Amino acid sequence: MLSAPFSTVARALNRRGLGRLRNLEPKPPVQRYERERPGDLIHIDVKKLARFRKVGHRITGNRQQGRSAGVGYDRVHVAINDARRLAYVEVLPDEQQGTAIGFLSRALAWFNSQGVECAQVMSDNGPAYISKAFTKACSVLKLKHIRTRPYTPRTNGKAERFIQTLCKEWAYAMPFQNSQERNVWLPRYLSIYNRLRKHSALSGRSPQQRLHELLC
């Protein structure tokens, strides 16, 4: 038996992030998987990136000189193919349901132009993705919508890892003078990523090389 009052113990657990039962349970091991066909599943997600008018503190090392106050954020919407890591990305002003639906439609059209017909889409439980409008759009597009379990973003790990790569190799890769210049470089980076960048999960091939092997 504990000598301290229950309320004291509860506060101590809360301070350590252990106030909820699920935080005390061991996390299950990550179930890694990969769909066989290139169109079986695409993962979608959104990354918020700050806009800026001058070179930021990540480059200058000075938060005061590198600050661009009041310019807001861009939302980087990503869609990545599960089997071959082929990626489609747009920088958009928000992540509202209409914006998310428009992005999904254009992403599907682009994947179709690459010879990939998508059957399923996986997302997290963001407000846009759980909306009735998004559910209806998936039905119209003949997509099965799979949502990750609450509080388990690693379920959508391929999108999460691609966003990390995108930030490292594009968004924070060089001292862009402003966010508009950063965004202009995105199509160039995506071309390199899809056509030329070797991927360890694809045995050293690029996404388009692996897709070409599969479709031929």
Where in this protein do the model-derived segments appear?
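Acidic/histidine-rich, metal-coordinating catalytic segments
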Residues: 95, 114-131, 149-151, 203-208
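RNase H-like polynucleotidyl transferase catalytic core
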Residues: 120-125, 139-158, 174-179
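Basic, flexible linker segments flanking DNA-binding modules
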Residues: 1-54, 127, 135-136, 149-153, ...
